[in-house]
Amino acid sequence: MGETQVASAQSFVLAFDSTHAAMAAQAAFKAAGASFALIPTPREISAGCGMSLKFKAEGAAEAQAFVADTVTGDAAKYATLYEATGYTKLS
């Protein structure tokens, strides 16, 4: 019988073009009970705001779905999702 592979959680960074959007997303993450860290936006990421949210998910699809379900309005409009390793842009 084959072994079942369990995906390990990956880290993602949600960067913003405005401080207002970052604060709104932070409130949305808190309301959803999500585990996250407010971090300085990495230099490798070009964003108008110096704050980003770092969180873990089982993969890019899960991270994108979580952000789409949790972050709304202007916060979603001015947010960009990246993988934390290599800062590959996802949305």
Walk through the language-model features, giving the residues of each.
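A generic structural signal for short, non-catalytic loop/turn and secondary-structure boundary residues
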Residues: A7, A31, S46, V71-G73
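C-terminal structural segments of small proteins and small subunits
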Residues: A57-S91
